[in-house]
Amino acid sequence: MTYSFDLTVVWALVIAFAVFAYIVMDGFDLGIGLLFPVLRPGTERDTAMNSVAPVWDGNETWLVLGGGGLFAVFPLAYAVILPALYAPIIAMLLGLIFRGVAFEFRWRDPRHRAAWDVAFAGGSLVAALAQGITLGALLQGIAVEGRAYAGGWWDWLTPFSVLVGASLVVGYALLGATWLVMRTEGLLQAQARRYALRLTAATVTAIALVSAVTPFLQGRYYERWLAMPNVLVTAQVPLLVALAAYALWRTLRGGAERAPFLIALGLFALTFLGLGISIFPDVVPGRITIWQAAAPEASQIFLLAGASVLIPIILSYTAYAYWVFRGKVDAHGYH
């Protein structure tokens, strides 16, 4: 059957959307956990938890959709990426488990709340760092021979992957801080605003470092970003990042509440766009394209029919949950 569109590209966009939705939605959840050690035990931590309590578990739906979509639609990529990145992926899942268990148990087990707070912060840190390391390892390249992973167990651990991991930790913390600026008031909001200002500078620095190194990882990255005439187009991305960072700084200094979080989301969108510019149309950079990794056309059609029903439902209940639980929160708002 002939279509006026490329099914494989459509699926690549669907999975990219799911991954981005997970990054920004669960990103501020993880950011709350990363900020937990600097929040005062008691009211501040309870308020921060209540700000994400109604939505945090639903946010992880997008991770399931992205991972499940990769397995179903791009099975070759799944078969190559998973063995290459077993360690950071397992670490991420363990971190998410610790974070989720601690989230609920700290309310039900007040005698050991301090221990659950440590588990919540530690799980958030491990999950965020592992996600960044996974991304960094994928960007730097995976050894492939034929249709299988050909590298070693520790190939994922490099200075670049650690840099990307640390950068994502800082970025998630920025999302968490701007979320608290939007959802809280009083002393906690003022404290979150101060942290957000510092984290803005740290995030921009991290983006600059990763962006400076990435073009030299592979020849195709260099060609995309620095070779003429491509640079005339791609140079707009770092320019927009600089403008977004300045707008974020201005709104934080100016006392805005919602704008900083929205601009921080825009900053993540720009970095995600930069990632797409670097790797598309590859799913394993420099090794496997989306067309080489794709499932048969019949499978893609069947799965797309299901996704066309499922994704609007997820978007609808997510939007409804955020609408119902909008507004300011306090230490007694949810649990």
Say what each PLM segment does.
Residues 1-58, 64-67:
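N-terminal signal-anchor module of multipass membrane proteins
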Residues 1-13, 71-86, 139-159:
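Helix-coil boundary and interhelical linker segments in multi-pass alpha-helical membrane proteins
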Residues 11-22, 82-94, 121-125, 155-169, ...:
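Alpha-helical transmembrane segments
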Residues 30-54, 71-81, 104-114, 176-195, ...:
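Juxtamembrane membrane-water interface segments of multi-pass membrane proteins
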Residues 55-126, 145, 224-232:
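Membrane-interface helix-loop-helix modules in multi-pass inner-membrane proteins
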Residues 100-106, 277-290:
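Transmembrane alpha-helical segments of integral membrane proteins
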Residues 105-260, 274:
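Long, contiguous internal "core" modules enriched in hydrophobic/ aromatic residues
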Residues 284-303:
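Short, membrane-exposed interhelical loops at transmembrane-helix boundaries
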